Amino acid sequence: MAISCAVGMEMQEPKMNGTLSTGAAAGYRQEREGFLPTTHGPAPGRKPVQFLDFEGKTSFGMSVFNLSNAIMGSGILGLAYAMAHTGVIFFLALLLCIALLSSYSIHLLLTCASVVGIRAYEQLGQRAFGPAGKVVVAIIICLHNVGAMSSYLFIIKSELPLVIGTFLHMDPEGDWFLKGNLLIILVSLLIILPLALMKHLGYLGYTSSLSLTCMLFFLISVIYKKFQLGCVVSHNDTVVESEPAPLQAFNSSCEAKLFTVDSQMSYTVPIMAFAFVCHPEVLPIYTELCCPTQRRMQAVANMSIGAMFIMYGLTATFGYLTFYSTVKAEMLEMYTQEDLLILCVRLAVLLAVTLTVPVVLFPIRRALQQLLFPSKAFSWPRHVAIALILLILVNILVICVPTIRDIFGFIGSTSAPSLIFILPSVFYLRIVPADMEPLFSWPKIQALCFGVLGVLFMAISLGFMFANWATGQSRMSGH
């Protein structure tokens, strides 16, 4: 339900040496009780701190759709593979931990935004560390989202020729107009670019709801195929028939692992982290949320993360219990191309990732504008040029780079822990003043430990990944 929002009184500039204006301090106290939503209202006679340069018009439900769509992405196709290399119980435990940690990190971000009245990720970096912090944050956001956009276009590049070839009864490898490189350029120009040129993110909520519907159809189909196929695989690990599996196949391949650790953890854990990154999109969605408060936005985040945790868990579990240890990094490759239901699933996934690209493009453009044009008014030529240049660069990357696996692993091991763990924790330590939270208070100790956890996660993941690259295990595993 859309509600008309009133903008609160102007907030004074906070000081970084430990003091806040009365209005800002009151607003901070109202919002700091915890990262789960509560029923406490604003203190009597006080107005909550509001963002002043934009009056949000996006409803609560549409914001949930936008953030859910920002969370849900190409990583969902690799979660069954991640479960195959961690085990059912270990995977679900890791997935739950990452979901809870993501919610906590959003709490840290929203607290910082409420304290200083800033709702742009890169501006929080500037407030915490000056111009250098702004540049570092902008670079991390751009790299992560370029990686996300690349993974979406990789899916289009690999799946769209198969879909069109199936409809036209043609060989995708033999006809020049079915080449993936040509098709991603056409999709980028005809579909993605027009959506990316919208001025406000809220309008994309309608495409977000459609995208989430497509991925829900993907989940339902994976569950259905589990019960239809059982565990039937051919010698090349691709499902060929819809008949019960022979006993020997079940004995050799169809045994679920509850807990396991192997060298592919260097890819599986980053895939899970990559699957929950939505932090660059949180503050833009917060800006456009109608009647924005920290509790209201935290409720949006909790609902979105909870829904995606359920969807991820079900998809990974039923996908893994269909293919077990033979499952590939992109689960759709396991199904036969002639299956009508899977053909519809491929269409749904293609539609979902295509409509997600414009949502991911928004924070990249915001970061570049804050970095390169901080004092410039809105300009349509600049708005269009940034979107066009970004799409050109990502298309070149997708055309030149042959595999999606190392992008998943590298982005999930570098920018993902930076955005989930490290940046929110250091922002909290630097921005929240000492008179609100002393340096050795429990919330700041928690934030410090959270940041250290992110550094350890990054170091361990990169260490395993570089070891795999050095020994050639990545290539031998088909990456």
UniProtKB/Swiss-Prot annotation:
Pfam families in UniProt: Aa_trans
Superkingdom of origin organism: Eukaryota
CC terms in the record's Gene Ontology section: plasma membrane
Activity profile over pH: Optimum pH is 8.0.
GO MF term (any one): active monoatomic ion transmembrane transporter activity
Principal subcellular localisation of the protein: membrane
Membrane topology field: Multi-pass membrane protein
SS bonds (residue pairs): C231-C254
Keywords tagged on the record: Cell membrane, Disulfide bond, Glycoprotein, Membrane, Transmembrane, Transmembrane helix
Name of this protein: Sodium-coupled neutral amino acid transporter 5
Source species of the chain: Rattus norvegicus
Source species taxonomy: Eukaryota, Metazoa, Chordata, Craniata, Vertebrata
